[in-house]
């Protein structure tokens, strides 16, 4: 029986309040409206961003809410005006979008869509501001326009990347956020040449994605920098050739790296959000050609300073959002990198849990035990 145009009742993991375990509830998911797509989610994974907003320590809490933004699924139905997607398509919902009409979308240099740029405070859909989720008639808020901790979700079509139907969704679902953020920061923004050296600041999931990018690019040395030495053995699996813990040195880490590399690395990628690490990442690149890329998100009031001579000596500092990938245009190509065995995804997946045990995924991340935990829907 077709569910097109009908309300679908399904299970979702609802966050009723900040920091409390998610509760599996039966929710009603309304049909997609104009420029929207309803997706059956098959696999989702937990990102640190989900945990950050679930804890709600640094922002206005918005509850009850359905979190989740790294996922893979199949289109169930499409709303009015959707022409590039149809039922049965294999897709990745993305936390940011590509309307295809704004100046950013028309620019080859930008992926910062005016309409669908990431918005953490919006609890409804762009079309009408309303939620497509409800329990007993009461709305449940969306998260990042994706809300993938639900067996069915409704997403703006501009936030949906159509991918190769042969790609295993339980693997490629992790491409839709953190991994691509790090990978693209290296491949698309830092752009190391084969044989060059790259320093990665922060060896969490995003930093390991950046290291994977350096490995794919053919970097000869990939130097990982982290305060947690327990991460070093794992980092070697991602192509990191040597690791440095700033706590082990009595001089600034940028000086340590400069001494290790005859004047500085060719490229650096900062993945922590620490202002101190941003300064270090910039000042550790070689003069004349060095490029540093900032990925980590700082606190709201943060600022940093560095001597202008660092720029005049031809060091370059760049920032990036989502690895400079346009969601609909570029993410299918990242999936193809996996399909042709250029990109290795399995090593990022450390745990798998059934949907009924989704809170275990939060435990693994809070304890620092996981890179990515796959949550199998319908299990």
Swiss-Prot record:
What is known about regulation of its activity?
Answer: Alcohol dehydrogenase activity show inverse correlation with the decreasing availability of oxygen. Slightly repressed by thiol-modifying agents N-ethylmaleimide (NEM) and 5,5-dithio-bis-(2-nitrobenzoic acid) (DTNB), as well as by methyl methanethiosulfonate (MMTS) in a dose-dependent manner. Inhibited by hydrogen peroxide H(2)O(2).
Under SUPFAM superfamilies, the record lists: GroES-like, NAD(P)-binding Rossmann-fold domains
Q: Which residues are noted in the entry as Zn(2+) 1-binding?
A: 47, 50, 69-70, 177
| Sites of N-acetylserine modification | 2
**EC category name:** oxidoreductase
The entry's cellular-component GO terms read: cytosol; plasma membrane
Recorded catalytic reaction(s): these are: a primary alcohol + NAD(+) = an aldehyde + NADH + H(+); a secondary alcohol + NAD(+) = a ketone + NADH + H(+); ethanol + NAD(+) = acetaldehyde + NADH + H(+)
The name on file for this protein is Alcohol dehydrogenase class-P
Gene that produces this protein: ADH1
């Amino acid at each position: 029986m077709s569910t097109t145009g009908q309300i679908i009742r399904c299970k979702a993991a609802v966050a009723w309040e900040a920091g409390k375990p998610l509760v599996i509830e039966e929710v009603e998911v309304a049909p997609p409206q104009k420029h929207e797509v309803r997706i059956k989610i098959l696999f989702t994974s937990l990102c640190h961003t989900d945990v950050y907003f679930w804890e709600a320590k640094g922002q206005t809490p918005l509850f009850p809410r359905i979190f989740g933004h790294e996922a893979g699924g199949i289109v169930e139905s499409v709303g009015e005006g959707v022409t590039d997607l149809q039922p049965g398509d294999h897709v990745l919902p993305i936390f940011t979008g590509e309307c295809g009409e704004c100046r950013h979308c028309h620019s080859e240099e930008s992926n910062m869509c005016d309409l669908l740029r990431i918005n953490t405070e919006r609890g409804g859909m762009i079309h009408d501001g309303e939620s497509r989720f409800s329990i007993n008639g009461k709305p449940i808020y969306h998260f990042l326009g994706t809300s993938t901790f639900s067996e069915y979700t409704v997403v703006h079509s501009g936030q949906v990347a159509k991918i190769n139907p042969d790609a295993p969704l339980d693997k490629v679902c992790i491409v839709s956020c953190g991994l691509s953020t790090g990978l693209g920061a290296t491949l698309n923004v830092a752009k190391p040449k084969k044989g060059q050296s790259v320093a990665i600041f922060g060896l969490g999931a995003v930093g390991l994605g950046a290291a994977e990018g350096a490995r794919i690019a053919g970097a000869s040395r990939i130097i990982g920098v982290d305060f947690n030495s327990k991460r070093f053995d794992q980092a070697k699996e991602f192509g990191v050739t040597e690791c440095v813990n700033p706590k082990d040195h009595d001089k600034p880490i940028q000086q340590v790296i400069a001494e290790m590399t005859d004047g500085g690395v060719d490229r650096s990628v900062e993945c922590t959000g620490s202002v101190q690490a941003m300064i270090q990442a910039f000042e550790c690149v070689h003069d004349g050609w060095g490029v540093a890329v900032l990925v980590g998100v700082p606190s709201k009031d943060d600022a940093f300073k560095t001597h202008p001579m660092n720029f005049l000596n031809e060091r370059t500092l760049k920032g990036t959002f989502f690895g400079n990938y346009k969601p609909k245009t570029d993410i299918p190509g990242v999936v193809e990198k996996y399909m042709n065995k250029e990109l290795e995804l399995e090593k990022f997946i450390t745990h798998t849990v059934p949907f009924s045990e989704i809170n275990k995924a939060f435990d693994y991340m809070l304890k620092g035990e996981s890179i990515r935990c796959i949550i199998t829907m319908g299990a």
